[in-house]
Amino acid sequence: MIYLAFFKLKIIQHYLLIVALAIGLVFSYHVKAEQKQVLGSWDVHYIALNTTFLTPQVAKQNSIVRSKFNGLINISVLDRQDKTAQSVVMTGEAKNLIGVVKKLMFKQVKQGEAIYYLAVLPFSDREQYRISIDINDGLEQRTLKFQHKFYAD
């Protein structure tokens, strides 16, 4: 009985993540893990999570290797005025607390009118990163900075 409840909970977690990716961070204001920063003329929504929360199908569609030691950074950039998704170039890095730097390679994913930028970040259990991402649309350049601690599931 406990196993069945745990299994149902995992299915629900995976379903919720698929929904969040499908409709985008634009509509995830009520998700506690969702975060937003206002950078110039943009609303930048971002979330960092473990890739094990992705279903195998979603991971495969986005060429993401699911692992308890892989984190996923998902970012969307919206125009502050009309809330349209912005096509930008992202470069970034993640630095752990002992100074090891890992480059972030972002992949642009378009779903309808939504645009997401995804990067995979390998990590060790309970590893904390300072993440810095340069965002450039050719007219404006801003830097998104945040910290996140990853846990192996």
Model-flagged regions — what are they?
Residues 15-26:
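Bacterial N-terminal signal peptides
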Residues 34-72:
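Beta-strand-rich domain onsets/edges
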Residues 137-144:
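Short acidic/polar inter-strand loop motif in beta-rich domains
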Residues 72-78, 118-120:
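Short edge beta-strand/loop segments characteristic of extracellular beta-sandwich folds
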Residues 129-136:
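Short, aromatic- and glycine-rich surface loops/edge beta-strands on solvent-exposed regions
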Residues 28-30:
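N-terminal signal peptide c-region/cleavage motif recognized by signal peptidases
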Residues 111-118:
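Aromatic sugar-binding surface patches on proteins
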Residues 1-13:
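N-terminal secretory signal peptides that target proteins for export/translocation
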